[in-house]
């Protein structure tokens, strides 16, 4: 099958298609993880994005449902240098997702690094004419920026779900903005009961569950669009312990009156170094975000707890008095290092400060 990747600046790359025969639009981003393509594709934070892997060979070890981070593929499309197994091709076909291979991903990665993420179109078909490519380029240019699309409603649970454990020592209400399953697993493994609720659940409904703490999950898109969620978080501050991961860190910062901004190409990979400003320890972390918190916008009673050692951006915040903290990186990994798994223990300990 033929395949073409069309960028809004007019760049056109032709390659070989795999997966579903269709066309999709989205923001083209890259991730530097060397393994974990199943976890990447099923991560809800990639909704609205076409994901490119910088590692050249994908599919080497097949596909297993145990590796899923949601109920299926959430990325809009997949860009790789070379696919090495039919399992990955079948996986994309099962979830109606197109992929392109046999293109210069190093060129594309450098382009995004230098110019920033771009709107793009990926099409896979038996034949693709020049006229079709010209028409798709015009559609790419008109396509909405990711900041103008409501993505969280597409990946959040529709109904509350209870994840029980045999001997619960804490209860967490998880505001699901597109949660990765390993976040839930990591809490349940620590004997924490998790009540997963839709992203727009009202604060008074959350409190009816009598949580020991509230966790705001990761998810896709621009945090500033989630005004209803931010309002609910504001009403929870000072009432119940709160923590957050990735998008949750941004939403908590906005609830405190801070600001967020879109990064040039974001942090997506499994080797991002962060520094704990309290202990001065450095951890290698898994990350997947295209927005960040503006440090100087945070109020005096909120301090930065972690920074990224590559670009000095905010990687976590902590309230100076209240039992509230959040991190921009992913302590649950999947894929990536487990260096900061201890933060789930810190989350559960928040109940002792109620």
From Swiss-Prot:
Q: Give the catalysed reaction(s), semicolon-separated.
A: hydrogencarbonate + L-glutamine + 2 ATP + H2O = carbamoyl phosphate + L-glutamate + 2 ADP + phosphate + 2 H(+)
Ranges for region CPSase: 1-167
What range does the record give for the signal peptide? Answer: none
Q: What is its EC number?
A: 6.3.5.5
PROSITE patterns according to UniProt: GATASE_TYPE_1
The entry's L-glutamine-binding residues are 45, 219, 221, 247, 250, 288, 290-291
User: Which keywords are on file for this protein?
Assistant: Amino-acid biosynthesis, Arginine biosynthesis, ATP-binding, Glutamine amidotransferase, Ligase, Nucleotide-binding, Pyrimidine biosynthesis
**Single GO molecular function:** carbamoyl-phosphate synthase (glutamine-hydrolyzing) activity
What is a single cellular component term in the Gene Ontology annotation?
A: carbamoyl-phosphate synthase complex
Q: Which GO terms describe its biological process?
A: 'de novo' pyrimidine nucleobase biosynthetic process; 'de novo' UMP biosynthetic process; glutamine metabolic process; L-arginine biosynthetic process
Q: Where is the Glutamine amidotransferase type-1 domain?
A: 171-354
- Assembly: Composed of two chains; the small (or glutamine) chain promotes the hydrolysis of glutamine to ammonia, which is used by the large (or ammonia) chain to synthesize carbamoyl phosphate. Tetramer of heterodimers (alpha,beta)4.
Instruction: Give the PANTHER family listed for this entry.
Output: CARBAMOYL-PHOSPHATE SYNTHASE SMALL CHAIN, MULTIFUNCTIONAL TRYPTOPHAN BIOSYNTHESIS PROTEIN-RELATED
The family line of this record is:
Belongs to the CarA family.
Q: What does this protein do?
A: Small subunit of the glutamine-dependent carbamoyl phosphate synthetase (CPSase). CPSase catalyzes the formation of carbamoyl phosphate from the ammonia moiety of glutamine, carbonate, and phosphate donated by ATP, constituting the first step of 2 biosynthetic pathways, one leading to arginine and/or urea and the other to pyrimidine nucleotides. The small subunit (glutamine amidotransferase) binds and cleaves glutamine to supply the large subunit with the substrate ammonia.
- Spell out the protein name for this chain: Carbamoyl phosphate synthase small chain
């Amino acid at each position: 099958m033929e395949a073409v990747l069309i960028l809004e600046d007019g760049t056109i790359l032709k390659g070989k298609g795999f997966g579903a025969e269709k066309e999709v639009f989205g923001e083209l981003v890259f991730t530097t993880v060397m393994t974990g393509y199943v976890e990447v594709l099923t991560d809800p934070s990639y909704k609205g994005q076409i994901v490119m892997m910088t590692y050249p060979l994908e599919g080497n070890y097949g596909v297993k449902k145990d590796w899923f981070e949601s109920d299926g593929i959430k990325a809009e499309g997949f860009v790789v240098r070379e696919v090495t197994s039919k399992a990955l091709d079948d996986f994309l076909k099962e979830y109606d997702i197109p992929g392109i291979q046999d293109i210069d991903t190093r060129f594309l990665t450098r382009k995004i690094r230098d110019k920033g993420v771009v709107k793009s179109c990926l099409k896979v078909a038996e034949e693709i004419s020049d006229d079709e490519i010209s028409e798709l380029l015009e559609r790419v240019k008109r396509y909405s920026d990711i900041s103008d699309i409501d993505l969280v409603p597409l990946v959040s649970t529709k109904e509350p779900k209870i994840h029980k454990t045999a001997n619960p020592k804490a209860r967490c209400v998880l505001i699901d903005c597109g949660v990765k399953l390993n976040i839930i697993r990591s809490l349940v493994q620590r004997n924490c009961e998790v009540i997963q609720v839709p992203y727009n659940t009202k604060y008074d409904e959350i409190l009816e569950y009598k949580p020991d703490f509230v966790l705001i999950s990761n998810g896709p898109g621009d945090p500033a669009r989630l005004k209803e969620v931010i309002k609910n978080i504001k009403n929870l501050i000072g009432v119940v312990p709160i923590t957050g991961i990735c998008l949750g860190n941004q939403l908590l910062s906005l609830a405190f009156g801070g600001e967020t901004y879109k990064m040039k190409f974001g942090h997506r990979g499994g080797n991002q170094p962060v520094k704990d400003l309290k202990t001065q320890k450095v951890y290698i972390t898994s990350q997947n975000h295209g927005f960040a918190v503006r440090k100087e916008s945070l109020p005096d009673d909120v301090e930065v707890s972690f920074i990224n050692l590559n670009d000095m951006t905010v990687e976590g915040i902590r309230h100076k008095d209240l039992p509230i903290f959040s991190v921009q990186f992913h302590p649950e990994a999947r894929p990536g290092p487990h260096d900061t798994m201890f933060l789930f223990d810190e989350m559960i300990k928040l109940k002792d400060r109620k």
